[in-house]
Amino acid sequence: MEKELNHPPINFGKTGALIINLGTPDSTSWFDIRKYLKEFLSDRRVIEVNPFVWQIILNVFILNFRPSKTAKAYKEIWMKDENISPLLYYTQEQAKKLSNSFSEQNLIIDYAMRYGNPSIKSKIKKLHEKGCENLIILPLYPQYSAATTATVCDEVYRTLMKMRWQPSIKIIPHYES
């Protein structure tokens, strides 16, 4: 079969493993904290109350007052030299160490955050671009909970529904510590 001109090379047969943590704001700024809190607290798996009432409470009260208090707490733990939250830093390190452990195999290991950046959507797109046909999704929560593991699954499937790509998927819902 003749290769079509101007067609990009296609890489097949790879497996992408995506380790996913809860999330963190991009910085300790009021705006970034507010953005993170809005995404997190708008998740119906996290806050299981009447969505109409909750959105009023969230947008009128919580998102106007809570970011200042939360920013103060983040500033205490923020890794200033790296300009990164500890959760993001250690999640990156986990992904690097896992990647080094499996470097000889046809496995690409990456990380994402359920809320904030890097997003599940951006990382799934990246794994697709690298030619992954299989996805292993590992939420970094040792026990299953709808507010943690299930919301990761929701976001993975929402992302895939919008793509013209359907890899084989293995989700690890819990693991022993």
PLM feature spans:
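Active-site-proximal alpha-helix that buttresses catalytic centers in soluble enzyme cores
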Residues: 1-177
